[in-house]
Amino acid sequence: YDSTNLLPAKAVVVTSVGMDHMRLLGNTIEEIADAISAAFRPHAVAVIGKTDPAAMNILEVNARRKKATVYRYGRDFWYDGKFLSYSGSLDFQLALRGVHQWYNASAAIQTVLALSSTELNNIDASDIQEGLREAFWPGRMETVRENPLIILDGAHNPHAAQSLRTSLDLLYPGKKWNIFFAAMKDKDWRSVLTQFLDLANHVYVVRMPYERAESPETIVEFLKEKGTSSSVCEEQDVIKCDEDALVFGSLYLVGDVRRLTRNAVHSF
């Protein structure tokens, strides 16, 4: 059983598998991949993106049990400056920022190509390129203010945090940030936050108006043990920051800050 099966689908795409929603899915990558496999449909297309090799193996085995047509990253398609597969290649520009988004885009291209002979026969290469140029995902490496800079990212588990860190190192090498962070109690926020401590000028732990939110004092105490400068702040303090800021750790936080920045712009 999987809740995604409530909707009909000609294709199912798994972009990556990480340690999240473990209360529902399992406590290991293998268990989570096995649970996610319930989303695959019989005799449909199954696209497996770039992720943990053990997870990829489990996903493929389960997809084939359902007689799905499987396309696997690194074997059937891949990304190396452009989309590549045994049937051809495609150059594309991507509006979404973040190294992992290039791999996700490649999985999306493979899905369209797999369906092009039946469901999507009116879509050509230029349509795909235009779609990727215009693709937008709020709260994913999103710049909501340019000067000083505010970047929002929904990373709230170790896997997503690693993707964010890789992207920051590539796009802003050596840059230090004022970090605004909050997390839910049921998330592995210590592993998330630890990946960014060497990038922090200061960590502002944002007090969140949600019952599930971790106590900011608990997070500050953890940072104190790590020797990292930190303090508690309110959500409104993010947009008052007069230096470059990085906001992550909770989708609730990202959503609230995004609304605050939009309201600040519209108030002028």
What do these predicted regions represent?
Residues 76-90:
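Acidic-glycine-rich active-site phosphate/pyrophosphate-binding loop
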Residues 1, 6-66, 189:
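Conserved catalytic-core segment of NTP-binding enzymes
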Residues 45, 149, 176-180, 243-246, ...:
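Residue-level preference for the first positions of well-ordered beta-strands
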Residues 49-69, 80-82, 149-150, 158, ...:
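C-terminal helical cap/extension that packs against the catalytic core
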Residues 3-6, 17, 21-24, 204-222, ...:
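Flexible, gly/pro- and Lys/Arg-enriched active-site loops
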Residues 238-262:
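A glycine-rich beta-strand to alpha-helix segment
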Residues 1-13, 17-22, 31, 88-202:
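Nucleotide phosphate-binding/pyrophosphate-handling subdomain across enzymes
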Residues 49-51, 62-80, 95-99, 125-135, ...:
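Beta-strand->loop->alpha-helix junctions that form or flank phosphate-binding loops
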